[in-house]
Amino acid sequence: MDGNHSGGLGLVGDIGGTNARFALVEFDGQDPRLIEPTAYRGEDYGTAEDAIEEYLRKVGVKHPDQAVVAVAGPIDHGQVHMTNLDWRISEDGLRRAGGFRNAKLINDFTAQALAAPRVGPKDLRQIGELPTSGEGDLAILGPGTGFGVAGLVRRHGQEIPLATEGGHVAFAPVDDVEIEVLRALTRRLDGGRVSVERILSGPGMEDLHVDLAAAEGRGVEALTAKQITERAVEGCADSLATVNRFCAILGSTAGDIALTLGARGGVFIAGGIAPRIIDILEKSPFRERFDSKGRLSGFTRSIPTHVILHPHTALIGAAVALTPEGRAAVS
């Protein structure tokens, strides 16, 4: 791809703990357009390079000029060992596998942050009474296989993403039920530390389902996160209680992150779980818990919250990172 992207194709990727998604990207002016976005199960491939080679064969493109791949995990000197998938990925390895002139790894929620201001109203669901704001810094967070967190600093017309590992901060219970959940998770981890990701994720929802019942002195059928969310939507009492508690904890955590990042411009919830439970989330204690910050409740009450419904937000953000402005922001 040349400097203004005319006539060329790039490759973008979004590799999480469960799925690896890829697309070709071309630019219409400064706006990226995704071509043939495709998802693969990570467990079906030995390496990320294998999945990329399969995708390039599928679309019949040999050597896109540049690539940006968003990954779930901390990147160190152009390398990452995935947090929830046993893949080691390097920029050098990507360049060799795809024949790219340049290849860049970015955090998956850095990509979400770059994309958030570009998501249109039809792909957003407002949670609470406040509409989106065109000003102020943003927080982007969300549960999926893990729990991702990023910020977006907006200054003087520039947007600078802030990569974090905020999903691994300690879980802070707010009532007796959540204290019992914390105790149960601590025992399950042999006395280990309980991060918010241990609850606000697909695997975390499965543990929460069991631990909430145990807190009431009873057992419950062990279910997958997919089963819990589906049954909750259908009205199953136990599953609905789990999802409501999940949403409440998500609200508390999102409010804490908004305070930490000073996200006056809004909080965006991304990831695979929130869109599946969106109607429950709207009616849940999410916003009440988000606002409930003691002496700083006035601060959080002024912050809008939205769920991102677009299925390829991280790919859009990776495409933004191919632009000159995006490259500068993630360099």
UniProtKB/Swiss-Prot annotation:
<feature type="binding site">
    <location>
        <begin position="13"/>
        <end position="18"/>
    </location>
    <ligand>
        <name>ATP</name>
    </ligand>
</feature>
<dbReference type="Pfam" id="PF02685">
    <property type="entry name" value="Glucokinase"/>
</dbReference>
<dbReference type="InterPro" id="IPR050201">
    <property type="entry name" value="Bacterial_glucokinase"/>
</dbReference>
<keyword id="KW-0963">Cytoplasm</keyword>
<keyword id="KW-0808">Transferase</keyword>
<protein>
    <recommendedName>
        <fullName>Glucokinase</fullName>
        <ecNumber>2.7.1.2</ecNumber>
    </recommendedName>
</protein>
<dbReference type="GO" id="GO:0005536">
    <property type="term" value="F:D-glucose binding"/>
</dbReference>
<dbReference type="GO" id="GO:0005524">
    <property type="term" value="F:ATP binding"/>
</dbReference>
<dbReference type="GO" id="GO:0006096">
    <property type="term" value="P:glycolytic process"/>
</dbReference>
<keyword id="KW-0547">Nucleotide-binding</keyword>
<dbReference type="InterPro" id="IPR043129">
    <property type="entry name" value="ATPase_NBD"/>
</dbReference>
<comment type="similarity">
    <text>Belongs to the bacterial glucokinase family.</text>
</comment>
<dbReference type="GO" id="GO:0005829">
    <property type="term" value="C:cytosol"/>
</dbReference>
<dbReference type="InterPro" id="IPR003836">
    <property type="entry name" value="Glucokinase"/>
</dbReference>
<keyword id="KW-0067">ATP-binding</keyword>
<keyword id="KW-0324">Glycolysis</keyword>
<dbReference type="GO" id="GO:0004340">
    <property type="term" value="F:glucokinase activity"/>
</dbReference>
<keyword id="KW-0418">Kinase</keyword>
